[in-house]
UniProtKB/Swiss-Prot annotation:
Swiss-Prot/TrEMBL keywords: Chloroplast, Electron transport, Membrane, Photosynthesis, Plastid, Thylakoid, Transmembrane, Transmembrane helix, Transport
Membrane topology reported for the UniProt record: Single-pass membrane protein
An annotated Gene Ontology molecular function: electron transporter, transferring electrons within cytochrome b6/f complex of photosystem II activity
GO terms for biological process, alphabetical: cytochrome complex assembly; photosynthesis
Chief place where the protein resides: plastid
Record family assignment: Belongs to the PetN family.
Protein function: Component of the cytochrome b6-f complex, which mediates electron transfer between photosystem II (PSII) and photosystem I (PSI), cyclic electron flow around PSI, and state transitions.
Protein name in the entry: Cytochrome b6-f complex subunit 8
Cited Pfam families: PetN
A cellular-component GO term for this protein: chloroplast thylakoid membrane
Cell compartment(s), UniProt: Plastid, Chloroplast thylakoid membrane
Transmembrane spans: 4-24
UniProt subunit comment: The 4 large subunits of the cytochrome b6-f complex are cytochrome b6, subunit IV (17 kDa polypeptide, PetD), cytochrome f and the Rieske protein, while the 4 small subunits are PetG, PetL, PetM and PetN. The complex functions as a dimer.
Amino acid sequence: MADIVSAGWAFLMVSFTFSLSLVVWGRSGL
């Protein structure tokens, strides 16, 4: 169960960072 929770948090952080970087790149015009 702990491994599933850890994997879920890892996936959440990766997806959040990826979406945030896309927003930053979009606003900077790259």
